[in-house]
Amino acid sequence: MDLLLGIIQGLTEFLPVSSSGHLTLLSHLLKTDLNAYQTAVLHLGTLVSVVLFAFDGIRRSLRSWRIILNLIVSTIPAGVFGVLFEKQIDQLFSSPRFLPLFFSVTALILMFTRYSSSGEKRMENMSFLDALLVGIAQLFALFPGISRSGITVSSLLFMKYRGEDALQYSFLMSIPVVLGAGILGLEKGNVTILAPIFAFLSGLFALYVLSRSVRSGKIWQFSYYCLFVAILSYLVG
């Protein structure tokens, strides 16, 4: 079970297909009780993988006070919403009822990137407004089925940021959110140490695939898979 949870978490955390949605669906299929805090513990494994994978870029980015301030702004919406509606969000992980809707939303967002022309805006020059907007977008990824990487990268592409910068900023945004959720998960979850290890290893592979898809402008292709999972979750729900 730990092997399966870890691999699914690692692959789906960074591929724009929603790790929380997959774990909620798996929990339903296997008749297991996997809540939001337990998935957060798995996030700690993928947190290590993103830090290692993008270490040089993260180190360079954090030398800029503007980027640091923007990250704080981007983190506030999801952080505040997650604290205020903690119980309601956790309840969403106990049932696949809304998975078809949320997976479909992710599919549509990804598909729209196919028709979005590439931009030239740089992460170093991001305005506080853009930082807030992408932070609000990340807020919706608290719902299982809506991909955090998918919605943040897509939002930045819609705002005409370069693919490389959209990817890098999405990586940076994930660190405080995943770390905070993971710490809570250590207190309330029930996942052994093996699951985060498997999540770390599969997460490295997923990061490589995501990077190639964003740089080649083909992140939209994951929309087909999300639509498939939306249909599957509807059939089994």
UniProtKB/Swiss-Prot annotation:
EC annotation from Swiss-Prot or TrEMBL: 3.6.1.27
Record localization: Cell inner membrane
Record key words, sorted: Antibiotic resistance, Cell inner membrane, Cell membrane, Cell shape, Cell wall biogenesis/degradation, Hydrolase, Membrane, Peptidoglycan synthesis, Transmembrane, Transmembrane helix
InterPro entries per UniProt: UppP
TM stretches of this protein: 38-58, 65-85, 92-112, 126-146, 166-186, 191-211, 217-237
Membrane topology: Multi-pass membrane protein
Broad class of enzyme this protein falls into: hydrolase
Gene Ontology cellular-component terms listed: plasma membrane
GO terms (BP aspect): cell wall organization; peptidoglycan biosynthetic process; regulation of cell shape; response to antibiotic
More details: Bacitracin is thought to be involved in the inhibition of peptidoglycan synthesis by sequestering undecaprenyl diphosphate, thereby reducing the pool of lipid carrier available.
Family note: Belongs to the UppP family.
Identification of the protein by name: Undecaprenyl-diphosphatase
Organism classification: Bacteria, Thermotogati, Thermotogota, Thermotogae, Thermotogales
Gene: uppP
